[in-house]
Design a protein with these regions (language model features):
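A Rossmann-like FAD-binding core segment of flavoenzymes
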Residues: 1, 5-44, 57-67, 71, ...
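Short amphipathic alpha-helical segments
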Residues: 46-50, 88-90, 113
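Rossmann-like NAD(P)H-binding beta-loop-alpha module
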Residues: 69-96
Length: 166
């Protein structure tokens, strides 16, 4: 925060926007731009078969109380955002021996430093895998087909079952 202030950035934490204060108000008051950091505080369903199995957990719930979960030795993390990086690192620090993170494409939401920290802690990254369903054995993926700009354009035939405890 100190570095941001030195750069001339004004910070208004814990400010409710939309009630008595609007983004237009901030711009009128001299703010050149507005960053709204809402965080990820609600679990998001994947909408796939198997996401309600006993070996499937929402990352945000796990991060709130890691000691309440017994993930096992081999953990699969679906997605590569900052919260997913936190899940991977926390799982490794809480006894998981192998944590593999999966992304549908090559573009990820996590910052480069979050990814670097997860890699230093031992997380593995697998790109080009789209989750189809989850079984008691672990996630089932389709392999993504990507164009020269690393955009997903389709999926290869067949599926790949991977093994994971959670």
């Amino acid at each position: 925060q100190k570095k941001l202030l030195e750069l001339g950035i004004r910070i208004r934490p814990n400010t409710a926007i939309g009630t008595t204060l609007t983004i237009e108000d901030l711009l009128r008051d001299g703010y050149a731009s507005v960053f709204v950091g809402t965080g990820v505080w609600k679990a998001r369903n994947l909408g796939i078969p198997g996401e309600c199995l006993s070996n499937v957990h929402f990352g945000i719930d796990y991060l709130a109380n890691p000691s309440a979960y017994s993930l096992g030795e081999k953990v699969a993390v679906i997605g590569m955002g900052n919260a997913a990086m936190d899940v991977a690192r926390t799982a490794l620090r809480n006894g998981a021996h192998q944590v593999t993170m999966y992304a549908r494409g090559r573009r990820i939401a996590a910052s480069s430093h979050e990814m670097a920290y997860a890699e230093l802690d031992g997380a593995e990254f697998v790109f080009g895998k789209a989750i189809e369903r989850i079984t008691e054995k672990g996630p089932v993926f389709k392999t993504s087909i990507m164009d020269e700009n690393n955009r997903v354009t389709g999926y290869e035939e067949g599926e790949e079952q991977t093994e994971a405890d959670s």
